[in-house]
């Protein structure tokens, strides 16, 4: 086996061309004087090429023409995303309600050419939603609700089924088995206003939940840890992160706010408490 902890003087050349193409089409139809329905389709294609060549200074103090295979890399990757859905909107006086539902299909492909050939393909199918309501109970009282579910797909570098040794002190590996991050959010707000006296009272609450997030599994202080199929060791002082899904991220926030005018200050005074 070889030890990856040796230190050398290097020169690195990097080239990363890419392009992004997207388009969308939508159609909206009124269902009544108070409601309407719209349909939407979006497509996005992202293509990138990465070439990083590292040359190690020889004993003769010259950089060779041949790149170092352990610190050089060459690959292409692409993301193709289709998104289709509809939105329903309802209006009555000062009350507004809107609901959106989308289906999204994202296909990822990567061709790793150097230092070894490796192809990675995966896809994600997700449903995202959004519901927004703004209800005027009367002149002084308003209720607001918001519920949404959104996804964030893994990055291209996180999905590649390779061990990247271009950074000598931070060797990292991809994980093609990653799942998207799905975040659900629910919030509500009650507002009581007294326009005559300029006073407002607000109660707000918000809950967020992500059943699975993406974080790094980190190997440190393990110089004998084998990082690839060739038996290369991590080496002294280096670290080895790898992205993984981690379950259970929850948060809850709430606050109360009271505002009133202060004439002698010619300004408003606000009191706020929250958790």
Name these PLM-found stretches.
Residues 1-275:
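Primarily recognizes Gram-negative and organellar outer-membrane beta-barrels
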């Amino acid at each position: 086996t070889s030890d990856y902890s040796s230190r050398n003087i290097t020169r690195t050349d990097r080239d990363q061309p890419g392009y992004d193409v997207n388009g969308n089409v939508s159609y909206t139809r009124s269902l009544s004087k108070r409601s309407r329905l719209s349909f939407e389709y979006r497509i996005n294609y992202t293509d990138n090429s990465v070439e990083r060549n590292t040359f190690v200074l020889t004993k003769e103090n010259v950089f060779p023409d041949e790149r170092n295979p352990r610190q050089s890399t060459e690959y292409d990757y692409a993301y193709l995303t289709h998104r289709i859905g509809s939105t329903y909107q309802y209006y009555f006086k000062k009350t507004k309600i809107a609901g959106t539902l989308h289906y999204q299909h994202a296909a990822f492909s990567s061709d790793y050419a150097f230092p070894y050939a490796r192809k990675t393909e995966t896809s994600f199918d997700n449903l995202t939603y959004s519901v927004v309501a703004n209800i005027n109970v009367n002149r002084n009282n308003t209720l607001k609700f918001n519920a949404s579910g959104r996804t964030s797909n893994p990055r291209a570098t996180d999905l590649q089924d390779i061990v990247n040794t271009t950074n000598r002190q931070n060797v990292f590996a991809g994980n093609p088995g990653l799942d998207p991050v799905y975040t659900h959010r629910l919030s509500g707000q009650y507002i009581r206003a007294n326009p005559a006296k300029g006073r407002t009272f607000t109660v707000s609450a918000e809950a967020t939940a992500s059943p699975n997030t993406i974080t790094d599994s980190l190997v440190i202080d393990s110089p004998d840890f084998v990082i690839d199929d060739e038996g290369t060791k991590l080496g002294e002082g280096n670290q080895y992160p790898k992205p993984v899904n981690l379950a259970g991220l929850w948060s809850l926030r709430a606050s109360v706010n009271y505002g009133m005018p202060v004439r002698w200050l010619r300004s408003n005074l606000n009191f706020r408490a929250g958790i």
